[in-house]
Amino acid sequence: MIWYVATLIASVISTRGLVAQGAHGLREEPEFVTARAGEGVVLRCDVIHPVTGQPPPYVVEWFKFGVPIPIFIKFGYYPPHVDPEYAGRASLHDKASLRLEQVRSEDQGWYECKVLMLDQQYDTFHNGSWVHLTINAPPTFTETPPQYIEAKEGGSITMTCTAFGNPKPIVTWLKEGTLLGASAKYQVSDGSLTVTSVSREDRGAYTCRAYSIQGEAVHTTHLLVQGPPFIVSPPENITVNISQDALLTCRAEAYPGNLTYTWYWQDENVYFQNDLKLRVRILIDGTLIIFRVKPEDAGKYTCVPSNSLGRSPSASAYLTVQYPARVLNMPPVIYVPVGIHGYIRCPVDAEPPATVVKWNKDGRPLQVEKNLGWTLMEDGSIRIEEATEEALGTYTCVPYNTLGTMGQSAPARLVLKDPPYFTVLPGWEYRQEAGRELLIPCAAAGDPFPVITWRKVGKPSRSKHNALPSGSLQFRALSKEDHGEWECVATNVVTSITASTHLTVIGTSPHAPGSVRVHVSMTTANVSWEPGYDGGYEQTFSVWMKRAQFGPHDWLSLSVPPGPSWLLVDSLEPETAYQFSVLAQNRLGTSAFSEVVTVNTLAFPVTTPEPLVLVTPPRCLTANRTQQGVLLSWLPPANHSFPIDRYIMEFRVGERWEMLDDAIPGTDGDFFAKDLSQDTWYEFRVLAVMQDLISEPSNIAGVSSTDIFPQPDLTDDGLARPVLAGIVATICFLAAAILFSTLAACFVNKQRKRKLKRKKDPPLSITHCRKSLESPLSSGKVSPESIRTLRAPSESSDDQGQPAAKRMLSPTREKELSLYKKTKRAISSRKYSVAKAEAEAEATTPIELISRGPDGRFVMGPSEMEPSVKGRRIEGFPFAEETDMYPEFRQSDEENEDPLVPTSVAALKPQLTPMSSSQDSYLPPPAYSPRFQPRGLEGPSGLGGRLQATGQARPPAPRPFQHGQYYGYLSSSSPGEVEPPPFYMPEVGSPLSSVMSSPPLHTEGPFGHPTIPEENGENASNSTLPLTQTPTGGRSPEPWGRPEFPFGGLETPAMMFPHQLHPCDVAESLQPKACLPRGLPPAPLQVPAAYPGMLSLEAPKGWVGKSPGRGPIPAPPATKWQERPMQPLVSQGQLRHTSQGMGIPVLPYPEPAEPGGHGGPSTFGLDTRWYEPQPRPRPSPRQARRAEPSLHQVVLQPSRLSPLTQSPLSSRTGSPELAARARPRPGLLQQAEMSEITLQPPAAVSFSRKSTPSSTGSPSQSSRSGSPSYRPTMGFTTLATGYPSPPPGPAPPAPGDTLDVFGQTPSPRRMGEEPLRPEPPTTLPTSG
C-alpha cells in the first residue's frame, strides 16, 4: 500500500515536470514562416504529454500581436473559438499548431501560442512560443484616380495612385507610353502626379504603374482639359475654275464638345455677303461649300470654331478662282501729257495673269513696234516717250491668258493735254531744331488743276503735319520722326509730277542703325551695321547680344570703339543660337534698337569615322625547308566578308621586317622562298589584303638556311649555277686575251714597221725650195710615215728609231752606238744621283774607240777591216753631209778651206763627224755640263758675253747692234784661261722636235705669233716668242698680262722684260745708240711673274783639235725628262731644234709667189706628221699671219744627232744672229743655281715646203705631262736683220687659251712619270 502511493506521487511529479518543460521551454527562439497569399501555412506549437498515464487537460490559445483577444482557442474536445477574420480559415493542427488557409496580406505579423494546464496554478507560471508570419503578395492598388478626370485650361490637377504588396511596390506615371519625371510641368511623389498650368497639350491618357518582384499593377486615367476648341485640321488653299464648287474643310476638338463653326470672307461673315450668302453652306463638321464660284468669290476665308469657353481659335485659307482675261473699267478718255512721256493703259483682270495684250487703233490692229518712241510694257500698257498728234485716235485692247479672253475692252479716246507743272518748288534741304515750326512751300498748276499731296519716303511719319491749300507742308513742332526725305506730288487726270526735299531735324537722339549683318564662325561673330543719323551730335555704338533661348533680361552689352561700324565678338559657344542688335547713343540719349538678327555659330567639323572592317590574319603559317629553298604554307583567314585580294609575305633576319613579296594571289596558300643566304636564321609572316585593308600579321614561322644549299651537281635541268658561271667567265677571259693579243701584235708590228722605215731615212742636208729633184713626196713614193696617224706612240718611243736587225758597223760607229746606248740608258733611268752619274760616266766613257784588228790585237781608232771613208761636207755646214740630191752643195768644206770660216766653227769641226740619218747614230755627250753664271739685269752693253759679227763686214747701217756674216762667241774670259768644253744640248726625248723635210702646206705656223717689224727698213726679228707658264713653286703662276715688247735685238736678255725694263729705260750710259720705238705691235707672250730676272747663257768655245770624246765626260742624268719636246716655230733665218738637241738654220730663198698665197713659209705644228699636199689646203685654225710670197725658205738640215749647230753661208751681207737655249737638266742643277737661270722664249722656226722629210714619230699630246709643276721652255730665238720680214698676221689666240712655250695647249702628264720640280731654262748665244 505504501509502495503504491509513492509510485503515484512520483509519476505525478514527473508528469508535471514534463508538461511544465514542454509548455515553458518549447522553442524559446522565435520562428519565421513565409507564405504566398492564397496559400495555406502551419504555425507550429508543440505539447509533450507524459509517457504513461492520462494526459492532463489543457487549453491552447493563439494570439496575434496587436489583437487583445485570442484569435483561436481550443479546449479538449470542445469546438474552437475562431476570430471572425479567420473564420473558416483557422484550425488546430496536431496538438497545438495553428493552420491558416488562404492567407492574406493582412494575416502577416507576429503570432503567440499559449498552452494552459488546468491542474496547475497560473499565477506564477507562463508558457508559449512566438512565430512571425510573412505574406508575399503582388502589388494591388488601394487608391486610384477615376478613369476620366477633367481639368480647366490654365489650372493644375493632381492624380494619386496607391498600391500595396509584399515587398512594397514602386509606383510610376506614364503619358502616352512615356515615363514622366519631375519637371516644371509635372511633379511625381509617392505615387501622386501633379500637372501644373494645364493646357490643351496636357490632355490625354495617363497610366499609373505599380510593380515589384512579385508582379505589377496598372491603372489608366484620361485627362480632359476644359477650354476653347482646338483646330485639328485647318483649311487649305484651293484653286478652282470659274463656275465650279469650292470646298474648304475645318475640324476642331474641345471639351465640352458643343462646337459651332463660323466662316468669314475678307473678315466678314459669309452669310452677310449678299452675293455669297445664297451660294454657301456650312456642314456640322465645319466644312464650307461655295457653289458656282465667281471671280469675285476669290479671297481669304477664315474658320472660327467655338464652345463658349475662352477665346476661339481661327484658321484661314485662300480661294483662287481662275478665269479668262478681261478688261475692267476701261476709261472712255485717255489723257496723255504733251512734251513728256505718257502711258496708254489697259486695266486687265486675269487669273492666271495675262500673257498678251493686243491693241487696236481706230478699229485696226496697232503695231506698237512700228511707232517711233512707243514701247509695249509687260502689263500690256503702251509707253509713249513724246506724244504727238499722230497718237490721237480711239483705242481698244484685248487681253489673253492661258484660259483665253473675255473679249476686248470698251473704246477709249486719246486726248493730248499739257501736264501739270510746279509753280513753287521746295528747297533741296531744310535743317531745323526739334520742337520748332517749319513750313516747306510747294505749288503747282495745270489743266485740269492738279491736287498737291505730301508723302514721306520710307517709313511714314506719325507726327503732326498737314498740307496747306496752297500746297505747302507745315510742321508745328518738329520731332525726331520728321527727319528724312519728303516728296511733293501734283496729280491730275493727265499725270503726276513730284518734287523732293530733305528734312534734317537737329538736336535729337541718334536714329537707329540699319542693315545689321552678322558673319559667324565656330566661336566668333563679326557684327557690322550702317549708322543712322546722329541727331546733330557725335554718336557711339554698342552691340547687344544674348543666347536665343535666354529671356529678355539676359542681353549683354558690348561697347564699340569710336570710328568703326563693326565689332568682332569672340568666346562664343559652337553650334549655338545667338541674337544681336545695335544701339546708338549721343549726348541727348539713345536710339531705338536696330532689328534683331539671330544666327547660329558653326559646329566643330565632325568627321564620321569609317566603319572598321576587321580582317582576321591568316592562320597556321608553316615553313618547310627543302634543297631549293623554303616552302611557306598557310590557311586563309577564318572570318572575312569579302574575298582576299592578295597576300603579303614578310621576312626578317634581325629586328627589322622586310617585304619578300607583296603580290601573292589571294587564291594561293603557299609561297616558295628562294635565294636565301646560307647559315642564316629567317623568320616569316604573312598578311592578308582585302579591299585596301591589311590584316594583322599571322604567326611567325622560323627556319634556318643551313641545309638549304647542297653541293652543286648536274641535274636533269642542266648545269649547276657555279659551273655555268665558271664557263661564262672562262669564255670571257679567253675572248679578252685574244683581243688583247691581237691588239698587242698589231702594235708591235706597227712599231717594227716604223723602225724599218726610219732606217731608210736619207741623210740630212740643205734642202732648197726651188730644186725640182725628186723627194718622197714629189716622186710619188710616199713613205708610210708621211700618212698621218691618230694613234699616239708608246712611252718607249726613244727606242723606236732603232733598226730591227743590226748592221755591220765600223769601230767608230760601234763606239758611237755603244756610247749612245749607255747614255740613253742613263737618261731613261728613273732613279738618279749625282754620285752615281759621275761614277758611271767615269767607268763607261771611253777615251778612244777600241776595236780588234785583223791580227786579233785591239787597236784604237778606225778599224782596218772597215776603212773610214771621209765624208764630204757642205761648204759652210761642216755638220751636214753632201748628198746626190742637191748638187749645189757638193763642195765640201775639206776641199775648200775658206779662210773666212769663223774660229768657232773651226774649233767645232773636230767634233762634227759624219753621221747617218738613222737615229741609231748618236754623238757621245760632251764631258761638260754647262755652268750658268748669274748676270745682272742690265742692257746689252752691260752683258759679259754677247753675239758679235765675226764674218765679213756689212755696210754700216743705223742699227741698234752690229752683226757680222757669221756668228761667234764673245766671252769675257781672258786668253790664259782654259776654255770649257763645248756645250751639249741633250736629247729632248721626243721625235716631235726633229726637222721635217716636207713641212705642211701652211702659210703660217700653228702658233700664229706676229713678227717683230724691223726699224729703218730692216727686220728686227722674224721669230715669234711664245712662252709657257713655268711655275717656280708648287702653285700655278699667275700669267702676266699681254705685255708690250719693243724688241731691238735678241742678243741681250733685255728682250724678255716688259716695257718698264726695256733697255731704253736704263741709264743712258748703258743704252745702245739706237733703240726700237715702243710703238711696235705687242708680242703675244705670257711671261710668268715668277721669273725674277733674265740671265744670258753662252756656250763655251770648243777646243780646236781636240776630240769631243777626250777628257772626262759626265754621265747624262738618269732622270727621264718630263717636259714637252721642242716645238717647231715659224721664222726665217733661225735655228730649228731637233729631237737630238740640234738647231737648224732656215734660210730664205726667193721664189715667185704661188697662186693663192701658198708660196710662203710653212710651219711645223705640234703634231709633226707627214703631210700630203692638196690642191687647196685648208688653213690651220691657228694661222696668225702670212709670209711674203716672194720669199721662200731654205732649211738647213743637219744630222739629227749633231750636238751643235753652225750658221750657214749666206749670200747676203748679214747673217742672222742666233740665240740657242738649252733644256734645263734638273739632275745636274742645284737649287741655288736653278734660281739664276735665264728664261728665254723659244723662236718659231720656218721650213721649206719642199724640204726633205725627217723620219720622226709624232707622239700624241696625251703622252705629254700636263702638270703645271714643270714645263719645258727650250727654244731658239733668231734676229734675222738681213732678211725681209713677212707682214704681220691676224691676232694671236684667245686670252682664255692656256698655251705652252710653243703655243700648244698643255696636255695631261704621262702616266707613271714622277713630277719634276720647275726649273727655268737657260739661254745660249752661239755663232757659227
UniProtKB/Swiss-Prot annotation:
Q: Which GO terms describe its cellular component?
A: dendrite; GABA-ergic synapse; inhibitory synapse; neuronal cell body; postsynaptic density; postsynaptic membrane
Tell me the residues on which Omega-N-methylarginine occurs. R1136
Q: Where is the composition biased (Polar residues)?
A: 1018-1033, 1129-1141, 1199-1214
- Spell out the subcellular localization from the entry: Cell membrane; Postsynaptic cell membrane; Postsynaptic density
| Chain segments carrying region Disordered | 758-817, 914-1040, 1106-1328
The record places domain Fibronectin type-III at 512-604, 614-708
This protein's UniProt keywords: Cell adhesion, Cell membrane, Disulfide bond, Glycoprotein, Immunoglobulin domain, Membrane, Methylation, Neurogenesis, Phosphoprotein, Postsynaptic cell membrane, Repeat, Signal, Synapse, Transmembrane, Transmembrane helix
Domain of life where this protein originates: Eukaryota
| GO MF annotation list | kinase binding
Q: Give residue ranges on the Extracellular side.
A: 18-722
Q: Where is the composition biased (Low complexity)?
A: 990-1001, 1246-1273
Q: Report how it sits in the membrane.
A: Single-pass type I membrane protein
Q: Which residues form the signal peptide?
A: 1-17
Maturation and modification: N-glycosylated and sialylated. Not significantly O-glycosylated.
Q: Where does the Ig-like domain start and stop, copy by copy?
A: 30-115, 139-226, 228-320, 324-415, 420-504
TM region(s), chain numbering: 723-743
Please indicate the ranges of residues that lie on the Cytoplasmic side.
744-1328
Sites of glycosylation? N241, N258, N624
Q: Which tissues and organs express this gene's product?
A: Detected in brain.
Q: Which PROSITE patterns match?
A: FN3 (PS50853), IG_LIKE (PS50835)
The record's family statement is: Belongs to the immunoglobulin superfamily. Turtle family.
Descriptive protein name: Protein turtle homolog B
Q: Which organism is it from?
A: Mus musculus (Mouse)
Encoding gene (name): Igsf9b
